[in-house]
Swiss-Prot record:
Coiled coil stretches, renumbered: none
Gene: dcd
Residue positions binding dCTP: 111-116, 135-137, 156, 170, 180
Pathway membership, UniProt: Pyrimidine metabolism; dUMP biosynthesis; dUMP from dCTP (dUTP route): step 1/2
Catalysed conversion reaction: dCTP + H2O + H(+) = dUTP + NH4(+)
Pfam families: DCD
Cross-referenced InterPro entries: dCTP_deaminase (IPR011962), dUTPase-like_sf (IPR036157), dUTPase_trimeric (IPR033704)
Protein name (Swiss-Prot/TrEMBL): dCTP deaminase
Source organism per UniProt: Dechloromonas aromatica (strain RCB)
GO function term, MF aspect, one: dCTP deaminase activity
EC numbers, comma separated: 3.5.4.13
Keywords per UniProt: Hydrolase, Nucleotide metabolism, Nucleotide-binding
Family annotation (CDD domains): trimeric_dUTPase
Summary of subunit composition and partner proteins: Homotrimer.
Amino acid sequence: MTIKSDKWIRRMAAEHGMIEPFSPELVREANGQKIVSYGTSSYGYDIRCAREFKVFTNINSTVVDPKNFDPKSFVEIESDVCIIPPNSFALARTMEYFRIPRSVLTVCLGKSTYARCGIIVNVTPFEPEWEGHVTLEFSNTTPLPAKIYAGEGCAQVLFFESDEICETSYKDRGGKYQGQEGVTLPKI
């Protein structure tokens, strides 16, 4: 597997709609203000967080169970910023919609700007032929409230292309998160 360059990312976005909306350059400023960067970088694409958030709360005193997740464990927020309580987390989604080619697997890593503040961004790989909005998980590891920004960069996607096409893609096996839109909770 080889990592793909900015030229490849631009070509795949333009010719195959791999990322929509797409920024062909790295954007570091908006309306004269510095922002957490997003867009195409040398060997990746910095994704943005949308304005939809689900902030975890324990008001119902439930047990967190990935096989039987209680959606009432979240407070839904639509805003340009989201405050995550201390030692808690929030779910969000990307502004970008992805269509991953059959020969490609991605790895997504949180941006150091957030990591240096104790905010960890977790995203699983995007598998071959998966498509949808990416559900993001922001963990606030600090004892203080933490702020995240919609419309700004939050993580970087790295694209790896195999020298051999996979036998069965995510789409072929009917992956449960195929075509997801909005913030998607756990499914079994």
